[in-house]
């Protein structure tokens, strides 16, 4: 399964994998890469910045996510969102307030 990976403009370490099932015969130039992603995710994700194109298989290792979860999501939804790792704090982010208060 081929996919393109985009970085979020709003959240550090958030990435979106977009399925490219017809690669290399598809023509994605000029298209909105997030056109098939739900509006709520698009809003949180912000402007996508292209990072790379990958060919995924069950034997491929990914740094932070299980490739089987990514492949399943790409096949069923057409996309996979990789959230920032827990505990990741961006010092330039605005404070979110007290949690659990």
Curated annotation (Swiss-Prot):
Please give the positions of the paired cysteines in each disulfide bond: none
InterPro entries for this protein: YcgL-like_sf, YcgL_dom
Domain annotation YcgL: ranges: 1-93
Which Gene3D superfamilies does the entry mention? Answer: YcgL domain
Coiled coil stretches, renumbered: none
Recorded superkingdom: Bacteria
- Record's protein name: YcgL domain-containing protein ACIAD2309
């Amino acid at each position: 399964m081929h996919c393109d990976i985009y970085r979020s403009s709003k959240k550090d370490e958030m990435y979106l994998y977009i399925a490219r099932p017809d690669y290399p015969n598809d023509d994605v130039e000029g298209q909105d890469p997030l056109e098939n992603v739900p509006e709520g995710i698009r809003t949180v994700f912000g402007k996508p910045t292209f990072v790379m194109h990958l060919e995924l298989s069950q034997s491929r290792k990914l740094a932070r996510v299980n490739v089987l979860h990514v492949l399943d999501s790409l096949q069923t939804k057409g996309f996979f969102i990789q959230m920032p790792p827990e505990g990741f704090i961006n010092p330039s982010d605005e404070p979110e307030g007290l949690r659990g208060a």
